[in-house]
A protein has these predicted regions:
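Bacterial Sec-dependent N-terminal signal peptides
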Residues: 1-27, 37
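Phosphate-end processing signature that detects enzymes handling 5′-triphosphorylated RNA
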Residues: 24-31, 61-63, 88-92, 104, ...
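Short, non-transmembrane alpha-helical segments in secretory-pathway proteins
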Residues: 25-47, 93-114
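Exposed beta-strand-loop-beta-strand "reactive/processing" segments of non-cytosolic proteins
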Residues: 45-73, 118-136
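Intrinsically disordered, low-complexity Ser/Thr-rich linker and spacer segments
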Residues: 69, 84-97
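A short, surface-exposed beta-strand/turn
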Residues: 69-85, 135-147
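Flexible "stalk/tail and boundary" regions
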Residues: 103-109, 113-114, 120-125, 139-148
Length: 148
């Protein structure tokens, strides 16, 4: 009985000792992602991030915050940004994260609107405005249509 209890105690202690190393190795962001955050969200604090593994793919979700400004960022396995969403009730995304063609089109066509979400889906870029309108652009930032 004492031997079984001792083995169980050693096993539990081993697990708790290994957890910090395991957490660090499974939850480090790719360099492209950390560079992107440093460039576009300098001064923001990373509140939380997770690594999501599917059968064939890996992606990362990162939440950054600076005062009242909060954003959710998603990256692919190489650290390329795939989605940016404002978590701050209608507050816009930083213009630096958007392609120049997209910024120019939105300013010209919807001068009172702000971009609150951007995502890349294959060869398309999807943009959501604070008026709930969704715009579709090609990979180069050329406007294609308003999405229903």
């Amino acid at each position: 009985m004492k031997k079984a209890l001792f083995i169980a105690l050693v096993a539990i202690l081993s697990v708790f000792t290994a957890l910090p190393a395991l957490a660090q190795s499974c939850c480090t962001l790719p360099k492209n992602a950390t560079d992107y955050i440093a460039k576009h969200f300098n001064g923001y604090e990373i509140n939380f991030f997770e690594k999501d593994r599917d059968v064939l793919d890996v992606d990362y979700t990162v939440y950054v915050r600076n005062g009242k400004l909060s954003y959710k960022l998603e990256f692919d396995k190489k650290g390329n940004v795939t989605d940016i969403e404002s978590e701050s009730r209608g507050l816009p995304l930083p213009q630096s994260v958007l392609p120049a063609n997209v910024v120019q089109y939105v300013k010209g066509a919807f001068p009172n609107a702000k971009v609150t979400e951007w995502s890349k889906d294959g060869n398309k870029q999807l943009v959501e405005l604070n008026n709930d309108m969704e715009l579709v652009f090609n990979a180069k930032g050329k406007f294609l249509r308003i999405d229903d």
